[in-house]
């Protein structure tokens, strides 16, 4: 297979963009991605595009992207894989170039979910990302769904709600330096623990906000990458993992098998181990999910993720900085855009240009998990080709 690199990346601020639609947000992210290509790129050089969008607030996604960006002369494909949509869209673009089909492609992720109340949005998402014969009628919207796992994890491990609060505090702290983050303010452990309960064990500060936003990356084959930059960020590995959809069929509620499978696949393709990862963007839709994911991604042994938190090793400056962007928790979470935005952050990290820079970062990991914990996508990036 041919090697593939990111040569440009861009994203909008994440937040409540009531005045903007998908047709506004997508061009903003695309324009920044094009502007960040060091040696420039012409629209005519883009041969295909993939568009990750979970919702369809503006209608037919792939047609809207083609129309809005004036890319009607190339194939555009919509990708939807619950909250793993963003990194799966990147995976599709990577595979298309690796196969030899194209030399240069565009990957965009976007969603606009703040047009409705949070309660309405939860049910709309659940209808798209749950088993409608079982989980959906039982009311397993996202907080309840993930709470089942995290409650069991807290029961079986030494971790406590204080550790969840410490994850939230860290992500808010990291977001302070990110001008595109939605929640740019600090919180304390005491505030997090005293916040109103959403569903046990999650308080308000354990939950990601719902967000509007878009992100884009431009991918190029190794044969042509020198046309665009002398500082490419290589996509070393990609992986997708799956699991049972209905919760009564899940074997262990204290782990996310899709994450384990996706991480193993991506790391095998990249030729790296968890110890090689210098910085990670982890899918912290809820604080407990970040904690469990430390173990599933191989950063901590079984039931020992709390040690990373207590040692502050997950901060920038620690042994495994996680979510220097602020993560979903504080940066925001437009589902289709989230994974692509993770790649945007890591593109900047690996080029030494991030707002919250991890010194000497060489290898980075992006991670999504979605649906009823039934799908995960992992991408491994590096500023080194091999």
Regions found by a protein language model. Name each.
Residues 1-84, 153-160, 182-188, 192, ...:
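Conserved active-site "lid/cap" helical segment
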Residues 1-23, 166, 197-261, 265, ...:
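Condensing-enzyme catalytic core mediating Claisen C-C bond formation in acyl metabolism
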Residues 7, 33-35, 46, 86, ...:
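Buried hydrophobic positions in well-ordered alpha/beta secondary-structure cores of metabolic enzymes
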Residues 42-52, 75-81, 105-110, 162-169, ...:
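Beta-strand segments within the central parallel beta-sheet cores of soluble alpha/beta enzyme folds
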Residues 53-105, 112-145, 183-209, 240-245, ...:
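Conserved catalytic cysteine-centered active-site region
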Residues 56-65, 247-251, 284-307, 334, ...:
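Short glycine/threonine-rich loop-to-helix capping motif typified by GTGT followed
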Residues 81-111, 143-177, 217-223, 334-354:
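Active-site-proximal alpha-helical scaffold in enzymes
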Residues 256-260, 264-287, 296-299, 328-331:
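Extended C-terminal subregions enriched in glycine
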């Amino acid at each position: 297979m041919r090697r593939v690199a990111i040569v440009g990346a861009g994203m909008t601020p994440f937040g409540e963009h009531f005045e903007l639609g998908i047709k506004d947000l997508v061009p903003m992210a695309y324009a920044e991605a094009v502007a960040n290509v060091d040696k420039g790129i012409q629209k005519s050089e883009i041969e295909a595009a993939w568009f990750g969008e979970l919702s369809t607030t503006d209608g037919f996604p792939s047609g809207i992207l083609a129309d809005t960006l004036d890319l009607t002369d190339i194939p555009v494909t919509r990708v939807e894989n619950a909250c793993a949509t963003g990194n799966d869209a990147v995976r599709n673009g990577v595979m298309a170039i690796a196969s030899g089909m194209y030399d240069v492609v565009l990957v965009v992720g976007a969603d606009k979910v703040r047009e409705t109340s949070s309660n309405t949005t939860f049910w709309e998402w659940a209808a798209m990302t749950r088993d409608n014969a079982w989980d959906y009628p039982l009311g397993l919207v996202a907080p309840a769904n993930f709470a089942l796992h995290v409650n069991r994890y807290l029961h079986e491990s030494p971790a406590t709600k204080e550790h969840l609060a410490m994850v939230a505090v860290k992500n808010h702290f990291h977001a302070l330096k990110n001008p595109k983050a939605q929640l740019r303010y600090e919180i304390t452990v005491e505030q997090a623990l005293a916040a109103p309960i959403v569903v046990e064990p999650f308080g308000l500060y354990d939950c990601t906000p719902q967000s509007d936003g878009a992100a884009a990356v431009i991918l190029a084959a190794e044969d042509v990458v020198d046309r665009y930059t002398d500082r490419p960020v290589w996509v070393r590995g990609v992986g997708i993992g799956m699991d049972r959809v209905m919760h009564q069929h899940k074997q262990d509620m204290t782990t996310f098998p899709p994450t384990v499978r996706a991480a193993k696949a991506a790391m095998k393709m990249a030729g790296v181990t968890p110890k090689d990862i210098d910085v990670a963007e982890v899918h912290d839709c809820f604080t407990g999910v970040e904690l469990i994911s430390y173990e599933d991604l191989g950063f901590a042994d079984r039931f020992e993720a709390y040690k990373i938190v207590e040692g502050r090793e997950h901060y920038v400056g620690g042994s495994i900085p996680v979510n220097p962007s602020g993560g979903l928790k504080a940066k925001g979470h437009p589902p289709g855009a989230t994974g692509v935005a993770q790649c945007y952050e890591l593109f900047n990290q690996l080029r030494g240009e991030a707002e919250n820079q991890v010194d000497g970062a060489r290898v980075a990991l992006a991670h999504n998990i979605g649906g009823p914990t039934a799908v995960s996508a992992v991408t491994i990036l590096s500023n080194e080709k091999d």
